[in-house]
Amino acid sequence: MLFRSPRVAIADLTRDDLAEAVEDGFRHSVLVCMASSYDAGVFTPMEDYLNRLEHKAFQNRTVALVENASWAPSAIKAMKAHFEKMANITLVDKTVTIKTRLTDAYVKELEELADEIMQKF
């Protein structure tokens, strides 16, 4: 089971309202950003989201990062660059890189990430 907290908000940045996703980011103490690599960076909707968080002075949060790529993963590096500009952001040590598709091994990695995040509570 991947969801281990009763208070979780999930946003699909390609479909959901960006303002609501930003609001949810401020509502919770831990943010998990999951995005695909795109053109040696991060997928455009996530880039827009991170720019908005940066503009709104997002701070004092714990952030975990997950990327998906079929080759040349770059999303985590791009997301880290955004969060490094923000004040008092604690990046979770464990990151997850999913190559191509979700497998049982990646599910195990995501569960380990969830365990690490839950230790913060």
Role assignments for model-derived ranges:
Residues 3-14, 21-121:
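FMN-binding flavodoxin-like domain, especially the glycine-rich phosphate-binding loop
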